[in-house]
């Protein structure tokens, strides 16, 4: 099932796409795509609905972030062996974890803002994992039972803030609009193998990233289990699982986003995003 949120920022409503691609309103069955509504059992109830009987939503609606109420936006660094190689970094012996501020989350097609003082704003297409029920000390074998579904995440990164300004990566990852999420939350039953998802990213029509989740160092089940040993994962938490090669900092010479650029990215079966880049006010 493809779940989404539509409407003006801060007032999005829950919806879904039917087989014909028509947007249907879900607000008569769930208040929002957050909290208990993301539990796999609740999602199964939604999947049993006759979508043709739901109200159709007319017009060209803005899509918001596909999940609401995200408490933790957890990112995994250097989790693709081919991406680690392009940056000259060693493959980590354990997952590298950092946090992205939830205030960075925006819709999949909202404008991407270059922050003040930025000279190295970079792109990263990533597979997002959305938690559906509380996970604490879970095994790898049972980890996917706690997943609601998957989405596209653009882990926008300011490399000077991230690397050159010392300390944790967080400040280079958390600028406003640096977390476009969606267009859809695709329930896990429609993603039989999260470790075999082609993904891509283009800047101004030029392909920059063309990879697959099959080159992840640590897979989805391992990451959910691993993280749950250190913190409880709550419904609506997002795990952004790393990026394949082709980021701007790995190019020779490096290449970064500038105002006027257009970024498009997507993952097979999970939809695509498109952002216009402009300077922050």
Regions found by a protein language model. Name each.
Residues 96-115, 135-136, 177-186, 244-248:
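Short catalytic-site patches enriched in acidic/histidine residues
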Residues 136-150:
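N-terminal accessory regions of nucleic-acid-interacting proteins
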Residues 5, 9-10, 54-58, 62-66, ...:
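Catalytic-pocket segment enriched in acidic/His residues
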Residues 100-102, 109, 116, 123-127, ...:
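Short, structured patches in soluble enzyme cores that scaffold and shape functional sites
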Residues 8, 91-108, 121-123, 258-269:
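Structural signature of FAD isoalloxazine-binding scaffolds in flavoprotein oxidoreductases
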Residues 1-95, 264, 281:
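N-terminal non-catalytic cap/leader segment that marks the start of a structured domain
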Residues 135-138, 190-192:
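Short helix-loop capping/hinge motifs at secondary-structure junctions, enriched
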